[in-house]
């Protein structure tokens, strides 16, 4: 049942109610483990959502309202999911599919790309906080490691909980490709243009970028190019 929708689709609560019903039906009819991918849309412009759920009016059309409603609906989902027989044997991964904006003072403003990520499985995975530079591409290898899966990896990502984990991140816009390793951020742009920035944290911005003269680290530039070329070749293979 759809109780609220906008140009993007149904509100998060309606989507989660459908998930609860669908997973319940799946669990009732088969003993085979299942995988579900859920995409919610309320945290998108025009940021409209059902009235009376949060303190910010549903017609205010504020990003903060979209975020608050997203949080509210997610909490409601976990509350309902915790009552289901499949909850105790399920691992939940929550993250954003992209950042809110890529506009800033530099080609790729790193502070805009900081998104949340959560792996949640009470009773299966002990709570902890990972204070490392981790990319979306690291989520699957990390999850597979937590599940104890044995597999041949073709991932670019790594297990973020491994002692051998190397902190790095891939970020991009429609025009530029970025590669962060250590405190050096390499940006590849059209027409063979490249720039490197050094992270110089400030009180306001832990990822403040300072443009370097020339290319101080040819090694990191070569690595960025090779990684993106390898990815492109793999994705366009016959």
Give, region by region, the residue ranges found by the protein language model.
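Solvent-exposed soluble domains appended to multi-pass membrane proteins
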Residues: 1-238
């Amino acid at each position: 049942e759809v109780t609220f929708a906008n140009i993007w689709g149904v509100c998060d609560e309606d989507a989660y109610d459908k998930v609860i019903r669908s997973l319940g039906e799946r669990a009732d009819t088969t003993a085979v483990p299942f995988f579900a991918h859920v995409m919610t849309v309320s945290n998108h412009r025009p940021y409209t959502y059902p009235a009376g759920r949060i303190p910010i009016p549903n017609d205010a059309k504020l990003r903060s309202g979209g975020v608050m409603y997203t949080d509210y609906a997610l909490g409601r989902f976990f509350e309902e999911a915790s009552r289901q027989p499949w909850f105790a044997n399920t691992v939940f991964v929550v993250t954003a599919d992209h950042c809110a904006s890529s506009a800033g003072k530099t080609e790729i403003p790193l502070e805009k790309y900081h998104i949340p990520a959560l792996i949640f499985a009470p009773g299966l995975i002990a709570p902890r906080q990972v204070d490392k530079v981790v990319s979306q591409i690291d989520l699957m290898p990390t999850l597979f490691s937590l599940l104890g899966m044995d597999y041949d990896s073709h991932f670019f990502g790594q297990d973020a909980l491994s002692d051998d984990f190397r902190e790095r991140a891939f970020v991009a816009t429609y025009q530029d490709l970025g590669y962060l390793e250590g405190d050096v951020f390499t940006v590849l742009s059209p027409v063979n243009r490249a720039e490197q920035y050094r992270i110089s944290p400030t009180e306001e911005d832990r990822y403040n970028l300072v443009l370097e003269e020339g290319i101080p680290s040819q090694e990191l530039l070569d690595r960025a190019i090779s990684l993106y070329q390898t990815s492109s070749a793999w994705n366009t293979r016959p």
